[in-house]
Amino acid sequence: MGIRRNDINFGIGPAGTGKTYLAVACAVEALVKERINRVLLVRPAVEAGEKLGFLPGDLTQKIDPYLRPLYDALYEMLGFEKVERLIEKNVIEVAPLAYMRGRTLNHSFIILDESQNTTSAQMKMFLTRIGLGSTAVITGDVTQIDLPKGTRSGLIQASKVLSDINDIEFTYFTAKDVVRHRLVQKIVEAYDEFDRNSVSKINNQDTSHINESDN
């Protein structure tokens, strides 16, 4: 991922490829070197339908379960106490995607994780929040979409609409990039093979029906 070269970066690939970890590492580096003033962690809370009012606790506590992978990476790099201090000072900010509307984010490093679960409208809204001196990293796995049936993924649409724009980079990870337990790579590859075979079987069935109709 050319995060240092581009203002907007998409990292697309299966679970365990280090997309989120790499994004957080780059955010921490930019913060330590004072290239940006703050880090924003954003993730769509699909399970809660972006309506977090029914959950107990304040905003940070409500969105925490959905941002746990981002927190884990931050704690590993900076330590728990430092991360908590930076959150208290709003140097690190945690926000559900729905709360980004109407904001302009200048001199910030913004990470949108699990972006496959954004709608097209949400993705457009997020991308148009980015202000002067800011870098955005959008990560997602198009094989793990949890949106309601019939809802188009904002990540899939963005990869088609924005692919030819300068200063926007798309990096695609594969099962070979998996950095978790070796079994995760095999699991990803097995599911990919299953999906390919399923599509092939459907296509063969369609061809068979067409041939029968011709006869």
What are these regions (language model features)?
Residues 2-112, 116-212:
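Conserved helicase motor core of SF1/SF2 NTP-dependent helicases
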